[in-house]
Amino acid sequence: MKNPSRLSSEDRRRAIVDAVKGVFADKGFDGTTTRELANAAGVSEALLYKHFPSKESLYAAMLDDCAKGAAFAEYRRILALEPSASTLVIMVHFVVARFVQGRRFGDIEKTILDRLAVRSLLEDAQFVRLAHKRFTGAWVAKFEESLKAAAKAGELQETSVRRDLRAWFVHHIAFALMIHLHPKVPAVDYKVSKDLLVEQAVRFALHGVGLMEKTIDRYYNPKALSLLA
């Protein structure tokens, strides 16, 4: 390991970002002082400000760093797929599995991200809004394009639920499951394995977005999808 005093500027930035994730997750954005961030990173406040002129810029860099993990690599692969009912199934499974299981994406990184998100929502939601601004626009657009493709192929049963809200509702179902499963003793005993819980939640969500039962049966293979990451 390099001597801390001899780290390059880029290595120093990366080290600071890695060091402060847990602090932000524990105390939130507003509850964290620059002194605490500097102490966690093992640098002075002056050096911290040299690399990150504000807490907001450090927050943004932390989010960018999180976007380099396995989950976001899969996210980008999914966005490259052609819009279709099959893509819709993959998208819903990915979201639910990421929140309910998470093991494929790295438990430590996932735990920090989830804690950051929950803490953010209990405060001013700045971290969550930043994440949405950077990642959800393309995702929601792909989701809507896939709904249109499924409808054109006769694989979607139209409902009164607006198409531009359906991707959000899928996310909220998955996020709520994650919160209830987060404690060491889950808040709800679903009496099924996590694999089966994912499958059931995905089927529920796919019905909600409008896919027909025969379409779900045709494209949804949870065992195969679990091997994609």
What residues fall within each predicted segment?
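A short secondary-structure junction motif
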Residues: 65-73, 120, 124, 146, ...
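Hydrophobic/aromatic residues within well-ordered alpha-helical segments
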Residues: 55, 62, 66, 92-95, ...
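Helix-loop "lid/cap" segments that line or gate small-molecule binding pockets
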Residues: 94-107, 115-123, 205-210
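Hydrophobic/aromatic-rich alpha-helical bundle segments in the mid-to-C-terminal region
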Residues: 4, 107-110, 114, 128-138, ...
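Hydrophobic alpha-helical connector segments
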Residues: 61, 74-112, 163, 167, ...
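Helix-turn-helix
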Residues: 15, 23-65
